[in-house]
Amino acid sequence: MNGGHIQLMIGPMFSGKSTELIRRVRRYQIAQYKCVTIKYSNDNRYGTGLWTHDKNNFEALEATKLCDVLESITDFSVIGIDEGQFFPDIVEFCERMANEGKIVIVAALDGTFQRKPFNNILNLIPLSEMVVKLTAVCMKCFKEASFSKRLGEETEIEIIGGNDMYQSVCRKCYIDS
């Protein structure tokens, strides 16, 4: 066995997906693995690099398609991918990297603000050795939150924002608002 595998962390906004991605990549760095992280280049909310909502920063390559960074990552054995739902080639890329013996760690939204599957991220589930569904805290009633609620009236799927544009909510608060 080549040791390659896929770890997938999914959940709503503000559930700690990016923080967990950074934690996992750091574990491998401590064990002397060569690690790289990749972020979606259109996500420039806080500046360059991978940022968490609580303003922790982590160095990252930027791309809109993962195939664009293939040549840059050949020497790395651990690949972290943030905002995986935005990459159109996420499934093919992760499968290829894992089959080549690389450890691939993906953080992604599983659902849109409309509670629909987010692009093809759910197609990674049957290919992943580990899947973790994280929850947030409902920003209305403070119960467990599994959904992301958009505050504005925009209808496009890809609108990148923070707590100025989205809330994490539980089922009841999603339906009630």
From Swiss-Prot:
Enzyme class per UniProt: transferase
Gene3D superfamilies: 3.30.60.20, P-loop containing nucleotide triphosphate hydrolases
Keyword entries, A-Z: ATP-binding, Disulfide bond, DNA synthesis, Kinase, Metal-binding, Nucleotide-binding, Transferase, Zinc
InterPro entries linked to this entry: P-loop_NTPase (IPR027417), Thymidine_kinase (IPR001267), Thymidine_kinase_CS (IPR020633)
PROSITE patterns with a match to the protein in the record: TK_CELLULAR_TYPE
Protein's job: Phosphorylates thymidine and thymidine analogs, such as azidothymidine (AZT). Part of the salvage pathway for pyrimidine deoxyribonucleotide synthesis.
Matches recorded under PANTHER family: THYMIDINE KINASE, THYMIDINE KINASE, CYTOSOLIC
Residues annotated for Zn(2+) binding in this entry: 138, 141, 170, 173
Active site: 83 (proton acceptor)
GO terms, molecular function: ATP binding; metal ion binding; thymidine kinase activity
Any Pfam family: TK
Family that this chain belongs to: Belongs to the thymidine kinase family.
Enzyme Commission designation: 2.7.1.21
Top-rank lineage group of the source organism: Viruses
Quaternary structure and interacting proteins, as annotated: Homotetramer. Two molecules of substrate bind to each enzyme tetramer.
Reactions the enzyme catalyzes: thymidine + ATP = dTMP + ADP + H(+)
Name of the protein: Thymidine kinase
Leader sequence residues: none
GO terms of biological process kind: DNA biosynthetic process; thymidine metabolic process
Record has Membrane as a keyword: no
Binding site for substrate: 113, 157-161
